[in-house]
């Protein structure tokens, strides 16, 4: 056993405009090559697009989308006696939120080319808030995998 104490988790800081941690987590995942101002610009344009299309508070649409994509369980590969089993494990809320953000951004990046990232992200978030879209499909796939491998839950 290590004698070193575990490091305390840092709470995510909130962004300057919406004063929301979730927005900042999203910006940090959009971020590429250290261009944070570009990441902020992409997200704020996406939020403005959501505001125009839905005429709702974009922050509530974002929260609803992330809540819809957040998985409860996932599978983890576990090697037991020479064979690998997909073992279902429960996910903590912070980890689930991080997965939801990653899946939403991945789904929006995979949308057909021709439009900018802000446009793709806004449409992916609006779809996720309406319970459809590729990110929601990914969550359902993870839940299906966990359900199919429920017999191996005791390998946890």
Swiss-Prot record:
The keyword rRNA-binding applies. GO terms for molecular function: rRNA binding; structural constituent of ribosome. It is found in: Plastid, Chloroplast. Keywords: Chloroplast, Plastid, Ribonucleoprotein, Ribosomal protein, RNA-binding, rRNA-binding. Pfam families: Ribosomal_S7. It comes from the Eukaryota. InterPro entries: Ribosomal_uS7, Ribosomal_uS7_bac/org-type, Ribosomal_uS7_CS, Ribosomal_uS7_dom, Ribosomal_uS7_dom_sf. GO terms for cellular component: chloroplast; small ribosomal subunit. GO terms for biological process: translation. Part of the 30S ribosomal subunit. One of the primary rRNA binding proteins, it binds directly to 16S rRNA where it nucleates assembly of the head domain of the 30S subunit. PANTHER family: RIBOSOMAL PROTEIN S7 (PTHR11205). Belongs to the universal ribosomal protein uS7 family. This is Small ribosomal subunit protein uS7c. It comes from Bowenia serrulata (Byfield fern).
């Amino acid at each position: 056993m290590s004698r070193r104490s575990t490091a305390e988790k840092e709470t995510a800081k909130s962004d300057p405009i919406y004063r929301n941690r979730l927005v900042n987590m999203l910006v940090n995942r959009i971020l590429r090559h250290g261009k944070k101002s570009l990441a902020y610009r992409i997200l704020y344009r996406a939020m403005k697009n959501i505001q125009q299309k839905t005429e709702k508070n974009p922050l509530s649409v974002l929260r609803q989308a992330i809540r819809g994509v957040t998985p409860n369980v996932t599978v983890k590969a576990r090697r037991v006696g020479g064979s690998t089993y997909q073992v279902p494990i429960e996910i903590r809320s912070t980890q689930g939120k991080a997965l939801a953000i990653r899946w939403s951004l991945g789904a929006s990046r995979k949308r057909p080319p021709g439009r900018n990232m802000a446009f793709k992200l806004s449409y992916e978030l609006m779809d996720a808030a309406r319970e459809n879209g590729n990110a929601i499909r990914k969550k359902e796939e993870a839940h299906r995998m966990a359900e199919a491998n429920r017999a191996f839950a005791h390998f946890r």
